[in-house]
From Swiss-Prot:
Its cofactor is NAD(+). This is Inositol-3-phosphate synthase. Pathway: Polyol metabolism; myo-inositol biosynthesis; myo-inositol from D-glucose 6-phosphate: step 1/2. NAD(+) binds at residues 70-73, 143, 180, 190, 193, 230-233, 281-282, 306, 309, 340-342, 355, 393-394, 422-423. It is an enzyme of class 5 (isomerase). GO terms for molecular function: inositol-3-phosphate synthase activity. It catalyses: D-glucose 6-phosphate = 1D-myo-inositol 3-phosphate.
């Protein structure tokens, strides 16, 4: 059975006019290596920690500024939100299609809340806590091309023509602000698009971004703003002592106009200085050590890296299944070809390397979890190939071969072909990232014994379900397995309303 909404009744949960308070017993384990009777033993000790959660239920008017607004992702997302808000339908060769938010975790997935008369009861994911309605989001952003969003939508060749015709009047007046352009960080083939750029030194560029954000907030009367990078993949920046290794050195390098400070890092600096959440949707190392330190010092949310939308999402499920089933993956070969601007930019070796790194590390935690299958340091052979084929456009082809060792020396091979409509998969992920980033800024908590409530760590691991290479605080384990990432996110939000984590034991029926 599916219900649209619910309210929790519990002595541990209190609803006030503007807040939800919950008291939550977090049950976990502590592993110690102890000397007992002259022999060291591993001992697992269950423990319970009491947490207080406090969630502000006042939903703000949200503005979202996209870096690369005129690209395939930005134009597709903007078009999709307008189509949903206006209730647009359009004819395809198969049927009359209604606008929807399929592919969005927050808008189109469900959670189990319990059972009723022996039947499982499910509710929308978004019913857990008050979230911004995507129809109410105000979009804006920057681009190195001055093309309006209607023309950008046509150039992208993602949406059906009938839909594009209906959306054009809503989008032709939407023109991105000039963006930061540095040809050293992206492929040379992007130069032909760069007709709307912010001139000046890096300090002047940061100041301009800050000015743009302030004016956007004022003009649109938004309460909160989230900025997300969906522009070109950049090459990796060199991390150098004295340049970008500390907060002070990074800010000084901006003042000195150091060439190795990337455009994405400049946008992120501007956001952090303004206390505006910044999310990196591409694989480059935007978050150099100095920037992470700056975000922590300002308690400003940062998240990334790289949207997890197609091939990598499948990989984070399949490898988790194989290793969890006691099957040993020994070779993973991933091939992609695509024809959109992302593919053209990735045809340059230095930008491809950024993508290769984010795609290749996705299985590390799953391999490390099973010392029966893998010796220390052992790892499957893992190769990632991306080629640019203009004809296929946004319809990316992903082909994977997984070779594994099975019982008694046997071999198992799984071959998968996945046609990933790149921007149609990425757009709802962008939506989830900005909505969850905003929501997380309204949640505070404290452990038993702590005096004051505090927000989540500025490095937002809560967003990891949506990213290929999750950014985590120093000393925090990186989790890539998709099921674990979703469980983490759902269970944290459940804790905010006093619900136990979903453990699937269903003991009442055993």
């Amino acid at each position: 059975m599916f219900i649209e909404s619910f309210k929790v009744e519990s002595p541990n949960v209190k609803y006030t006019e503007n807040e939800i308070h919950s008291v939550y017993d977090y049950e976990t384990t502590e592993v110690v290596h102890e000397n007992r009777n002259g022999t060291y033993q591993w001992v697992v000790k269950p423990k319970t920690v009491k947490y207080d959660f406090k969630t502000d239920t006042r939903v703000p008017k949200l503005g979202v500024m996209l870096v690369g607004w005129g690209g395939n992702n930005g134009s597709t997302l903007t078009a999709g939100v307008i189509a949903n808000k206006e209730g647009i339908s359009w004819a395809t060769k198969d049927k009359v299609q209604q606008a929807n938010y399929f592919g969005s975790l927050t808008q189109a997935s469900s959670i189990r809340v319990g059972s009723y008369n022996g039947e499982e009861i499910y509710a929308p994911f978004k019913s857990l806590l008050p979230m911004v309605n995507p129809d109410d989001v105000v979009f804006g952003g920057w681009d190195i091309s001055d093309m309006n969003l209607a023309d950008a939508m046509a150039r992208a060749r993602v949406l059906d023509i009938d839909l594009q015709k209906q959306l054009r009047p809503y989008m032709e007046h939407m023109v991105p602000l000039p963006g930061i352009y540095d040809p050293d960080f992206i492929a040379a083939n992007q130069g032909s698009r760069a007709n709307s750029v912010i001139k000046g030194t890096k300090k002047e560029q940061v100041d301009q971004i800050i000015k743009d954000m302030r004016e956007f907030k004022e003009k649109n009367k938004v309460d909160k703003l989230v900025v997300l990078w969906t522009a070109n993949t950049e090459r990796y920046s060199d991390v150098v002592v004295g340049l970008n290794d500390t907060m002070e050195n990074l800010l000084a390098s901006v003042e000195k106009n150091e060439s190795e400070i990337s455009p994405s890092t400049l946008y992120a600096i501007a956001c952090v200085l303004e206390g505006i959440p910044f999310i990196n949707g591409s694989p480059q190392n935007t978050f150099v050590p100095g920037l992470i330190e700056l975000a922590i010092s300002k308690n400003c949310l940062i998240g990334g890296d790289d949207f997890k939308s197609g091939q990598t999402k499948m990989k984070s499920v399949l490898v988790d299944f194989l290793v969890g089933a006691g099957i040993k993956p020994t070779s993973i070969v991933s091939y992609n070809h695509l024809g959109n601007n992302d593919g053209m930019n990735l045809s340059a070796p230095q930008t491809f390397r950024s993508k290769e790194i984010s795609k290749s590390n996705v299985v590390d935690d799953m391999v490390a979890s099973n010392g029966i299958l893998f010796e220390p340091g052992e790892h499957p052979d893992h190769v990632v190939v991306i080629k640019y084929v203009p004809y296929v456009g946004d319809s990316k082809r992903a082909m994977d071969e997984y070779t594994s060792e099975i019982f008694m020396g046997g071999k198992n091979t799984i071959v998968m072909h996945n046609t990933c409509e790149d921007s149609l998969l990425a757009a709802p992920i962008i939506l989830d990232l900005v909505l969850l980033a905003e929501l997380s800024t309204r949640i505070q908590f404290k452990a038993e014994g702590e005096g004051k409530f505090h927000s989540f760590h500025p490095v937002a691991t809560i967003l990891s379900y949506l990213t290929k290479a999750p950014l985590v605080p120093a000393g925090t384990p990186v989790v890539n397995a998709l099921s674990k990432q979703r469980a983490m996110l759902e269970n944290i939000l459940r804790a905010c309303v006093g619900l136990a984590p979903e453990n699937n034991m269903i003991l009442e029926y055993k």
